């Protein structure tokens, strides 16, 4: 059963029928309002160093203080698909370099959640497993894929 927080999250991270690559989504707008100093010139050489990367990731923390957080693994997959769709549109038009980095940063945080957030039910674990198998992103990332699968089935002693 979906609680009100799930519903709010999933409605917020839904691609609208009239979505266009030129339009900045509400989620992107919220992030830029808080972190424009980080993303305005993110492609500058000084911002591409490992130190700058670590500072940025440490400061943003997946934007969990400004964007709705997923409550279940199903919510994580819904949001992942949302960002995947936005990313496809951004690359198609090459619109907004800083916005592409926002997407990668949020997806990195969502990926961490896939590795640690426990499924609510066996049915959810199975649904997320099927989603994972269909998601191209995880194809060449064996250790990450394994980590998520172990989270879904529960780790056992050898």
Question: Where on the chain are the PLM-derived regions?
Answer:
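Sequence/structural signature of long amphipathic alpha-helices
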Residues: 1-158
